[in-house]
């Protein structure tokens, strides 16, 4: 059986949602959630849930968020055999939403996946052509 190799981002999503009218320039009460995200990781997880053997080639930091993503991939059945451990922090997306779920602001730190160079993928050429 063939497998799919996904090359893409994996990051931790931090979402803050105001429980009332958002007031700028101050702390607002609300709920904060943390979840595994990233377009590449999301695609890989959904393929694995469909029963497709899936490997994710991504860049993770050697930090707590990297551990969260490694655990989430393991639980979803997504292989990380070729994941690269970077000096950068694991990708993080921080979003602040209004009570209605409208975007107020967001910040992303994708320096880990942005550090991926084509030369780092050359060693996977044979596997990529067989996937």
Residue locations for each model-derived region?
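Glycine-rich phosphate/adenosyl-contacting loop at the front of the ribokinase-like
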Residues: 1-59, 64-68, 74-75, 93
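Secondary-structure boundary/capping motif
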Residues: 2-3, 79-81, 127
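Residue-level detector of anion-binding/catalytic polar loops
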Residues: 53, 79, 103
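Short glycine-rich, polar/acidic loop-and-turn segments at beta strand-coil junctions
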Residues: 58-62, 84, 98
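A glycine-rich helix N-cap at a beta->alpha junction
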Residues: 72-87
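Conserved phosphate-binding/catalytic loop of the ribokinase/pfkB sugar-kinase fold
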Residues: 85, 95-131
């Amino acid at each position: 059986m063939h497998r799919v190799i996904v090359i893409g981002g994996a990051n931790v999503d931090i979402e803050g949602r105001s429980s009332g009218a958002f007031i700028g320039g101050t702390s607002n009460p609300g709920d904060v959630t943390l979840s595994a995200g990233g377009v590449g990781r999301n695609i890989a997880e959904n393929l694995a849930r469909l029963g497709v053997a899936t490997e994710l080639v991504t860049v993770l930091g050697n930090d707590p968020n990297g551990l969260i993503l490694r655990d989430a991939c393991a639980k979803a059945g997504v292989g990380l055999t070729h994941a690269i451990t970077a000096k950068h922090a694991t990708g993080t997306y921080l979003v602040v939403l209004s009570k209605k779920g409208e975007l107020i602001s967001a910040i992303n730190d994708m320096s880990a996946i942005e550090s991926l160079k084509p030369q780092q993928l050359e060693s996977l050429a044979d596997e990529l052509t067989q996937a």
